[in-house]
Amino acid sequence: DAKIDSMFEYENYTTYKFQLSPPYNSNEPLHGYVIYANKIKTALKPIIHFPSAWAIGSNSDDWIINSTIKDFNYLLMEGYVVICPVYYSTYNRKKTLKTWWANDTEAYKNTIIKIGKDYKRSIDFIESRNEFDINDLSYMGYSWGSIMSNILLAIDDRVKSAFICAGGLQVQKSKPEIDPALYTRRITIPVMHITGKNDGIFDYENSQIPMQKLLGTPLEKQEMIVLDG
């Protein structure tokens, strides 16, 4: 039931908005944006993107297209297409989160579950598009997107690889249904993770290393790059 609208060319890129029925009871559609370079004539290699925590505080998604082109131009020009779903409780959708910080409330649990359902529904959309090579689907996330990868990469095996930056394993208590430590060990795909050893939020010893140790990916398919700073 995907609806495609607002397709237009922006300089050397094509972008469009998609809308889907959400996989849960809701009056608002799940929507998102697709961005790719016009020069690419072969099947596009899809990347499903998860935003930073800025998406929780923002009430508009107007800047997604411009920022994606600016930040990921090097990927677009290499034949990748970036898909940016507007997940539950982000941007201009109904807000049930005030922070990315985990807690053990039912409200937080239900929000994360809905985000996971939006993620899987968005992958359904990617799989339905003939111009995308679903067999080359990858995940990309920074900060909150890195944290959420602990759960998301474990719940859909159509994603074949992941690049995450900053983040780690959340140590705050949450409901067992969404405890990231129970999911991380189920991730088996290749993962590249770039972190900072002096990260003041995602501590190297208590967040970054535990995530790496729990990761179910074989060591030869993990690449953890730790920067000074």
Which positions does each model-derived feature cover?
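N-terminal cap/lid segment of alpha/beta-hydrolase-fold proteins
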Residues: 2-42
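Short beta-strand element of the alpha/beta-hydrolase
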Residues: 31-32, 43-54
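Alpha/beta-hydrolase
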Residues: 48-51, 85-87, 165, 227
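Cap/lid segment of the alpha/beta-hydrolase catalytic domain
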Residues: 53-117, 123, 174
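Primarily recognizes the serine-hydrolase "nucleophile elbow" in alpha/beta-hydrolase
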Residues: 120-183
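Short alpha-helix in the alpha/beta-hydrolase fold that links the catalytic acid
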Residues: 179-180, 189, 203-213
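Short beta-strand/loop motif that positions the catalytic acidic residue
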Residues: 187, 193-195, 199
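Catalytic histidine neighborhood in serine/cysteine hydrolases
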Residues: 208, 212-229
